[in-house]
């Protein structure tokens, strides 16, 4: 399985070369997970799967453009701009790949899903943006070849907001390593926040690499290709 990380910029202004584009992952040039930039559709994917509908994962949301490519479209909940969206209620198959949804806590008003993507005995987990993953959902995760997750905040705890009994926001890179490393051989990071650009990208990537212990940590750049 070949994975191209199309963009690594979070919901911030562009500040460095190689970290300009928003979120998108191209699987074997066949399936697109998230469409943070309109140009990603130039890859002519056979299907699109959304983790959630924030604008940096769904480019058409700010301008309220209809998103109507003539291919299968999947997401965690209905959206007025995607009339043909298939709502995900459990494991499904598309283009020969098996997707297992993992509920993820991220937004206050939007539902979010990560996905375990399987083919030919290889397993990839794309988390989307993460405030937290419940223990019961972590328990559903099998051994993985690769995780791709976010790096909005380098500090432990990230930035978590609370409203009544709900949390939302982004947890920190150290927390994600602790949550995900028991399941994976490698963890790749993208969706960088402002912290990443306070130094040079090379220095910030070294900050991530310095947290490496038993699991390989991979700070990504726009267009990075990984294979499992």
Which role fits each region the language model picked out?
Residues 30, 35-76, 143-148:
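Active-site metal-binding motif and surrounding structural segment of the metallo-beta-lactamase
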Residues 8-10, 30, 35-38, 53, ...:
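Active-site metal-binding loops of divalent metal-dependent hydrolases
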Residues 13-19, 82, 159-168:
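Acidic/histidine-rich helix-loop elements
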Residues 134-224:
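Cap/insert and terminal regions of metallo-dependent hydrolase folds
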Residues 39-44, 91-96, 136-142:
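Short amphipathic alpha-helix with an adjacent loop that forms part of the alpha/beta core around
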Residues 2-5, 70-121, 217-226:
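Metallo-beta-lactamase
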Residues 1-43, 111-128, 146:
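Conserved beta-strand hairpin/beta-sheet module of binuclear metal-dependent hydrolase folds
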Residues 3, 25, 52, 99, ...:
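Divalent metal-coordination and catalytic microenvironments
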